[in-house]
């Protein structure tokens, strides 16, 4: 089912997320994507805790990140997370911007739905 539900999260780039040039290390962008995705799922009332109670897991099966410009130590970044599809996959789009509204990064993730009792995907 195609949907379009968005949430905006704001974070300050922490010192432990940057390199010696005070630029956020590229792998740490994924951590901010995950924190933003968790906030959106909390907002929807169906977070990972609820999924687990229902017997499901949602592992990331695809991640695509485009880096446009760097984030720096102590920058405030805005992550707009949009859930675009939910059925046999959860598909999210992310836009990371700085306080000036400049695009820093854009990303997409896909999560498969797995039944924990048999570790089978819920594809039809």
Task: Report residues per predicted region.
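HotDog/MaoC-like acyl-thioester-processing domains
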Residues: 3, 7-9, 72-76, 83-124
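Hot-dog-fold acyl-thioester-processing enzymes
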Residues: 2-60, 114-124
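Hydrophobic beta-strand-centered segment that forms part of the acyl-chain substrate-binding groove
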Residues: 40-78, 82-91, 104, 112
């Amino acid at each position: 089912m195609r949907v379009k539900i968005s949430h905006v999260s704001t974070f300050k780039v922490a010192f432990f997320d940057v390199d010696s040039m005070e630029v956020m290390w590229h792998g740490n962008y994924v951590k901010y994507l995950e924190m933003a995705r968790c906030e959106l799922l909390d907002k929807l009332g169906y977070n990972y805790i609820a999924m687990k109670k229902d017997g499901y897991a949602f592992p990331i099966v695809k991640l695509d990140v485009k880096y446009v410009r760097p984030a720096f130590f102590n920058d405030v970044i805005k992550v707009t997370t949009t859930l675009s599809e939910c059925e046999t996959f959860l598909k999210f789009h992310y836009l990371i911007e700085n306080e000036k509204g400049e695009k820093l990064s854009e990303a997409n993730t896909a999560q498969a739905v797995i039944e924990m009792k048999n570790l089978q995907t819920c594809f039809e």
